[in-house]
Amino acid sequence: MRNKAKGFPNPISFNGNKANNADEHASKRPDGTTRDRPQERMRSSNHFNSL
């Protein structure tokens, strides 16, 4: 069965909830350019934990 047939709720939006250090680990700079080393950025953030 598909999700809608089972009665799952609509997707949740997180408006206004932003981590304190989200700008430091963002994929884009304020001027719109992409950061060069995304793997290092992910390792430095607290969202990715290696075992």
UniProtKB/Swiss-Prot annotation:
Induction line: Expressed only in the forespore compartment of sporulating cells.
UniProt KW keywords: Sporulation
Compositionally biased intervals (Basic and acidic residues): 21-43
Top-rank lineage group of the source organism: Bacteria
Chief location category: other
InterPro entries xrefs: SASP_SspK (IPR012611)
Annotated localization: Spore core
Cellular component per GO, a single term: endospore-forming forespore
Ranges where the record places region Disordered: 1-51
One example of a Gene Ontology biological process annotation: asexual sporulation
HAMAP family reported in the protein's UniProt record: SspK (MF_01504)
Family: Belongs to the SspK family.
Protein name listed in UniProt: Small, acid-soluble spore protein K
